[in-house]
Curated annotation (Swiss-Prot):
The lineage of its organism: Bacteria, Bacillati, Actinomycetota, Actinomycetes, Bifidobacteriales. Residues 162-194 are annotated as: Disordered. This is Crossover junction endodeoxyribonuclease RuvC. The active site is at residues 7, 68, 141. One of its GO terms (cellular component) is cytoplasm. It comes from Bifidobacterium longum subsp. infantis (strain ATCC 15697 / DSM 20088 / JCM 1222 / NCTC 11817 / S12).
Amino acid sequence: MIILGVDPGLTRCGVGVIEAGEHRRLSFIHVDVVRSSPDITQDLRLLAIYNGLSEKMDRFAPDAVSIERVFAQSNRNTVLGTAQAAGLAMLAAAQRGIPVALHTPTEAKLAITGNGQAQKVQVERMVTRVLNLTKMPTPADAADALALAICHALRPAGALQGGEREQHLTAAQRQWAEAAQNSTRRRKNSDRGM
């Protein structure tokens, strides 16, 4: 299984590609950062990120895309750009019929280091070790993208949807899923005039 990990960002969007073989054997394929210049308009920045992600998906034809789930941060502009980049990754995957999984930073850290509160340098070292790399991937966005791909490969739920996936959710993930379902129901009911 080829897994493409995405660490979303508007200036630097990390992309890491691995292969998960039998017995969870992981192999490095590619790592890169898709960039957009802060000197161009927002629409052109989004287009640059979308085109870069689309090119990677077309080039590597992943079986799954693993994207960092965006959480609120204190810097509104940062979270907006990150959420937009995550949405572009989901769109590019959906257009190609590729299943998408969202993983929190804590999940990725836990999967790769065994510690959900691990520091960035610990994650980078473990990514390097797990994938047998000769040096740490840089910048950090690239290492994070590989960590997300590794997380997806090692998670028992993977990209499963529905009940089987729900067995493996943390309490916070269950609350998030319930809130998303309730929001969807409210929207559908309001569209029907209920």
